[in-house]
Amino acid sequence: MYSEKGTHSIEVCFSPLSWPLYEKPNALVIVTDIFRASTAICAAFHNEVKSIIPVAEISESEAYKQKGYIVAGERDGKNLDCADFGNSPFNFLDPALKGKTVVMNTTNGTQAIKAASQAGNQVIIGAFINLSAVCRFAMEQEKDVLVFCAGWKNRFSMEDSLFAGATVEQLVVASKGKFHTTCDSAVAAADLWLMAKGNLLGYIEKAAHRHRLKKMCLDDVLEFCLTFDFTSALPVLENGKLVDQRTLK
């Protein structure tokens, strides 16, 4: 997948700890947290929520709750005391959320979103369930691309890295020379993806977070999180809130 040919580069950041090393203020940043935050966010916009406010601190969630907001949040898989529900994608498909604003706070995903937002980049949210929409948008932007894996408590995450690899493959191959990569982490993610894509659900059995979810009886979402193109929703960060890019046209 290593390629020096192409107008724009694509890189992969495997961990929030490495994020400060990827200073590219003009790049499009794709934040992903497959199990489960980014999948839940994409599902929410498929369900036509109005917006999502990502926050990093529990105190922020508590303050929004006191103001009457719907709050979704978890730490280590356990719902926050102030939360109406956690971060299962199925929670966000509740028809009652249509047209509503939800405040979201998670162990990994919203932390990465906040970090990306502070760098001043254009930020979108990616998951397998909106992979084609993400890649199509990226190809339209005429920018370098950086896939930011939320990981697990600053550690490498297999599922996020697989999504990164799928994105690298689509942008380098499908764009027919528009993108190139000389980034080792992008090449490694693409190689991991090439090994796994024939049986993604089977391959993910090796992932540590898959087993964390199983121990907490939260693995009912596994297959959904690995479903391709369930939605064409494209969450974008605008003035501190996530909105569906389709509604901005």
Say what each PLM segment does.
Residues 1-10:
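N- or domain-start disorder-to-order transition segments that initiate the globular core
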Residues 10-11, 27-30, 50-53, 68-71, ...:
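Structural motif
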Residues 128, 133-135:
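Active-site C-terminal subdomain of aminotransferase-like
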Residues 150-160:
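Phosphate/ribose-phosphate-bearing ligand recognition and processing surfaces
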Residues 12-23, 37-49, 55, 59-102, ...:
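Residues that scaffold, gate, or flank divalent-cation-dependent active/transport sites
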